[in-house]
Amino acid sequence: ARQSSDRRHLAGFEDQAVYLDLAEPESFPAALKDCRYLLHVAADYRLWVPNEAAMRKVNIDGSIALLRAAQHAGVERSIYTSSVAALGLTDDGSPADETTLILPAHHVGAYKRSKYDAEQAVRRLAQEQDIVIVNPSTPIGPGDVKPTPTGQMVLDAARGKMPAFVDTGLNVAHVDDVAAGHLLALTQGRSGEGYILGGEDLMLRDLLALVAELSGRAAPKLRLPLAPLMPLAWAMERIAERTGKTPLMTPDILRMAKKKMFFSTHKARTELGYAPRPARQAVADALI
């Protein structure tokens, strides 16, 4: 963890914690000393950033430097946490998998671009060291102390702060299943291979309805068309560039919503023994 990070999720493990910052390669050797395995889970996960170069420095340069440092330190195997954001999408909305064709148009926004470029660099590294790649979808569940953008959406919906939705879809995974998938990749995964750690495909309206049901609120019923929102999103982004405050929506977020991010976990199930639970459980645990 970084020295500046919120470490509430490490309660009870403080004596085992080591400190590392992807933007500070000089912190790597001490953190990797006597380390047999590395699970590189960290990333700059934001849907909007005022400075894309800073995100790329962490997600790409920092990741490659860390994996090279792990090799130098004698680490036997590394697990690199990529994202489904780095994968291709289908034109018809059917579930994509690890072999789906990747097109530049799929990588909308700084985060997706950085994760795609990082994964490609990691795949090249995997030709010379033992690295397994995992691609989590949308983890939801307990312990999201920051919270992540997805966790914030669930909290906002539970508080009645999302009266409307756009017509899009996503794959929801319980965060504990994603964690278990990392350990399965460590013991069962093939070096150089990638594995989607997903869960259940849901339309956004159905996810919000599930959050509403479990939190005792009415589900949002207003569906907003994407095209009329684009000028508003553009204006919000211009304001954010001046203030530095994260906008409610951006043109890139709306462009991403045009594609359903549905994914198959068949490869992880068959090769790793991955067994995700229903989205209902993930949402219920996120609301505890």
Question: Each predicted region: which residue ranges?
Answer:
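Conserved Rossmann-fold NAD(P)-dependent oxidoreductase catalytic core, especially the SDR/UDP-sugar
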Residues: 58-110
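Mid/C-terminal beta-alpha module of Rossmann-like enzyme folds, strongest
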Residues: 181-248, 265, 280-288
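Conserved catalytic-site region of short-chain dehydrogenase/reductase
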Residues: 47, 84-94, 139-145
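NAD(P)H-binding glycine-rich loop region in Rossmannoid oxidoreductase-like domains
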Residues: 4-61, 69
